[in-house]
Design a protein with these regions (language model features):
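Conserved ABC ATPase signature
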Residues: 168-172, 176
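Conserved ABC ATPase "signature" region
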Residues: 94, 145-163
């Protein structure tokens, strides 16, 4: 699997430090079915046995051509995609065996910024509602005013304006929507973020700004 090619930063890690995320032998295989009875005749090995650790404050990049399994690996780590085999440990917990209910409290700690910003946003929600909703679910902020103030600050951090809170997703360009999605992911103060080519649609100057923020 090409998703097993990595780029790591040069963060100094103590040998005694425990990884925030540990992935061992992660596999995601999709069955290939044929015939009227839809019998399984083979498997597509989207992810086939990857291993890596990520420590607090560290950045790791999965590098590979389109369709090699990078997105599938990210979704499997967050339990958004069922894995075929392997173990995912997050902050000491074996999340690969967690149910949806058990994963719910961890959604604050583990976030993803999807490659398609429009598909990951509710077109009927204003930007304010989209950013504030996860804060309400995770009980971040003591009041609605606190949450709105935080939403404004996050928008400004990603190069947007406070008045954009009252608008809807269709009123923005692809790059602007992606910046909004990044602000939404940061709203719950996660420990770990998966970025699925999250800055690929942004201008170079904005890319640098957002990467520094992350």
């Amino acid at each position: 699997d090409d998703a097993s090619s990595f780029i790591k930063d040069h963060t100094c890690v103590s040998e005694a430090e425990t990884p925030l995320l540990s992935v061992r032998n992660l596999k995601v295989h999709f069955p290939v079915r044929q015939g009227l009875l839809q019998r399984v005749v083979g498997h597509v090995k989207a992810v086939d046995g990857i291993d890596f650790d990520v420590y607090r404050g560290q950045t790791l990049g999965l590098v590979g051509e389109s369709g090699c399994g990078k997105t599938t690996a990210g979704r499997a780590i967050l339990q958004l995609q069922k894995s075929t085999a392997g173990e995912v440990m997050f902050d000491g917990s074996a999340v690969s065996s967690f149910s949806r209910r058990q994963m719910r409290p961890l959604r604050q700690e583990m976030q993803i910024i999807f490659q398609d910003p429009f598909g990951s946003m509710n077109p009927r929600m204003t930007i304010q509602a989209a950013i504030i909703e996860p804060m309400k679910l995770q009980r971040i902020g003591s009041s609605r005013t606190d949450r709105i103030d935080r939403a404004v600050a996050l928008l400004e951090e990603v190069g947007m304006l406070p008045e954009h809170l009252r608008r809807y997703p269709h009123e923005f360009s692809g790059g602007q929507r992606q910046r909004i999605c990044i602000a939404r992911s940061l709203a719950v103060e996660p420990q770990f973020i998966i970025c699925d080519e999250s800055v690929s649609v942004l201008d170079v100057s904005v890319q640098a700004q957002v990467l520094n923020l992350l």
